[in-house]
């Protein structure tokens, strides 16, 4: 199965191509241009370098938020435009769930994206069981205090809002985590 994944939720645009469980291509671009200028050339380059066309894609995975409203619209519209002519399946992917899926081990991962004005889009997951502990939501950084303090397992903050959270809470409770590469889309 060929899966083309698109991420336009933040200021960095990303495109990846998976063939079954194997990553064939991955690129992220934060070049100062808008996603409307960069996304389609990124997809075109991806397909050409992998020797594929849109007809070879079995599934499009697209970031469905939370994130930049305009960025999400660009990604969703692009994927809809590519998928529609061949009625190719599309799978919406939570930004925060995708961040969590890149991490493995024991403990809790709290995904945080900067939503500005001292807020983060956040969700939390148990790493061992992949159970969701907090739903996707925009929260004031201070509103996460109860969750952080009650967390009994090692707590890992990930995402571009991790620093905002890290600076608010006891350093003994928190770890910053780097992603583990894996390909799992359900």
Residue positions per predicted region:
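N-terminal beta-alpha supersecondary unit
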Residues: 1-64
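Surface "functional belts" at beta-alpha junctions
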Residues: 22, 89-173, 177
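Residues at secondary-structure transition points
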Residues: 30-38, 69-73, 77, 94
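Phosphate-handling active-site elements
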Residues: 48-55, 84-93
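DPxDG-like acidic metal-binding loop motif
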Residues: 61-89
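Single conserved hydrophobic/aromatic residue that forms the stacking wall/gate
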Residues: 174-186
């Amino acid at each position: 199965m060929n899966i083309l994944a698109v991420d336009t939720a933040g200021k960095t645009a990303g495109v990846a191509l998976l063939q079954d469980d194997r990553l064939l291509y991955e690129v992220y671009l934060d070049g100062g241009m808008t996603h409307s200028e960069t996304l389609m050339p990124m997809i075109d380059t991806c397909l050409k370098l992998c020797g594929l066309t849109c007809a070879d894609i079995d599934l499009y995975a697209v970031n469905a938020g939370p994130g930049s409203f305009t960025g999400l619209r660009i990604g969703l519209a692009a994927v809809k435009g590519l998928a529609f002519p061949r009625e190719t399946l599309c799978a919406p992917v939570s930004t925060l769930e995708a961040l969590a899926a890149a991490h493995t081990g024991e403990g809790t991962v709290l995904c945080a994206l900067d939503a500005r004005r001292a807020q983060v889009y956040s969700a939390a997951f148990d790493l061992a069981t992949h159970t969701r502990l907090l739903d996707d939501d925009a929260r004031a950084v201070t509103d996460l205090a109860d969750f952080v303090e009650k967390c009994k397992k090692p707590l890992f903050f990930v995402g571009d809002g991790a620093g905002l959270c890290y600076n608010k809470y006891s350093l003994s409770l928190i770890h910053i985590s780097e992603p583990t590469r894996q390909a799992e889309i359900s």
